[in-house]
Amino acid sequence: MGFSSSLSCSAMGALIVGCLLLQASNSNAQLRPDFYFRTCPPIFNIIGDTIVNELRTDPRIAASLLRLHFHDCFVRGCDASILLDNSTSFRTEKDAAPNKNSVRGFDVIDRMKAAIERACPRTVSCADIITIASQISVLLSGGPWWPVPLGRRDSVEAFFALANTALPSPFSTLTQLKTAFADVGLNRPSDLVALSGGHTFGKAQCQFVTPRLYNFNGTNRPDPSLNPTYLVELRRLCPQNGNGTVLVNFDSVTPTTFDRQYYTNLLNGKGLIQSDQVLFSTPGADTIPLVNQYSSNTFVFFGAFVDAMIRMGNLKPLTGTQGEIRQNCRVVNPRIRVVENDDGVVSSI
């Protein structure tokens, strides 16, 4: 079964959310949803079919592709710099602490890019492929659809140092989270709370959970905001001095579904990582009313999520003649230098 035939009735009903919010979003004027309408009509089906096929063997890939988009956009904007491998000119962002042995889905993006290049050579940017893949991943997992503004171009460099400092930590306090989001231009409480809802599916490694289970902030005690029953369960899954790479579901109730359960979990002290639970457990925080709203109304959460995703997708995009359209998402295009020999013959090298 292909991408178009896999859409459920509930997902199709969520189309309304995206349509209502497109006009309300402060979309970059140079980005538009119909950017590839004439130049690469099959782009959505190619990306969607790739994800559908991947989900058959890797139910986690949808959440991973959404996270890949987030980690790309927070470092100099949504420019696919995260996809670049090491070169003589720069160090890859994949080696940065928040990404190494954590961010995944690169091979899936490679397959999408290869298929798109066969259909529409040198037309679609890797940055737009990541953006579309994140949107379709949310939709296929039961979340909303929205018209994705397109027309980004790809960076010709990576930003290893910035990736080490710009991305929020799973151990962040609410103040630190707000600073990280504001630093990239996402300065509304709804940006933080709605985008954090991306943790309604997917998994995290035990190494990002265990400090709050056994020695929260150096107290030799667990995080007091943890639900006692949930604490017991997490200690079973992530024993002290155990394997830090073991994976735990962000949402133990509906682990592969994009829904509002994440916020219900926060109300019950069942946020998996510290940077999730602080949205509700920080006294007097302006994020608390939003957690309450999103936990009780799917339409409100989906609407806020779509709006925040469009805002994040519009962070400092490269457009027009900026950057390039990479032929291979892992490397910058080879530079062609035109030379003329003594006989006046022009060639490129």
Curated annotation (Swiss-Prot):
Disulphide bridges, residue numbers: C40-C120, C73-C78, C126-C329, C206-C238
Compartments in which it is found: Secreted; Vacuole
Catalytic activity: 2 a phenolic donor + H2O2 = 2 a phenolic radical donor + 2 H2O
Pyrrolidone carboxylic acid: modified positions: Q30
Cofactor(s) the protein needs: heme b; Ca(2+)
Binding-site residues, heme b: H199
GO terms of molecular function: heme binding; lactoperoxidase activity; metal ion binding
Binding site for Ca(2+) 1: D72, V75, G77, D79, S81
Residues making up the signal peptide according to the UniProt record: 1-29
Keywords, in A-Z order: Calcium, Disulfide bond, Glycoprotein, Heme, Hydrogen peroxide, Iron, Metal-binding, Oxidoreductase, Peroxidase, Pyrrolidone carboxylic acid, Secreted, Signal, Vacuole
Source taxon at top rank: Eukaryota
Purpose of the protein: Removal of H(2)O(2), oxidation of toxic reductants, biosynthesis and degradation of lignin, suberization, auxin catabolism, response to environmental stresses such as wounding, pathogen attack and oxidative stress. These functions might be dependent on each isozyme/isoform in each plant tissue.
Cofactor note: Binds 1 heme b (iron(II)-protoporphyrin IX) group per subunit.
Main localization (coarse): secreted
Induction of its expression: By methyl jasmonate, a plant defense-related signaling molecule.
Active site: H71 (proton acceptor)
One annotated GO biological process: hydrogen peroxide catabolic process
Keyword NADP: no
GO cellular component terms listed in the entry, alphabetical order: extracellular region; vacuole
Protein name (database record): Peroxidase 23
Amino-acid positions noted as binding substrate in the UniProt annotation, renumbered to this chain: P168
Class of enzymatic activity (EC top level): oxidoreductase
Site residues (Transition state stabilizer), renumbered to this chain: R67
Organism: Arabidopsis thaliana (Mouse-ear cress)
EC number(s) reported in the record: 1.11.1.7
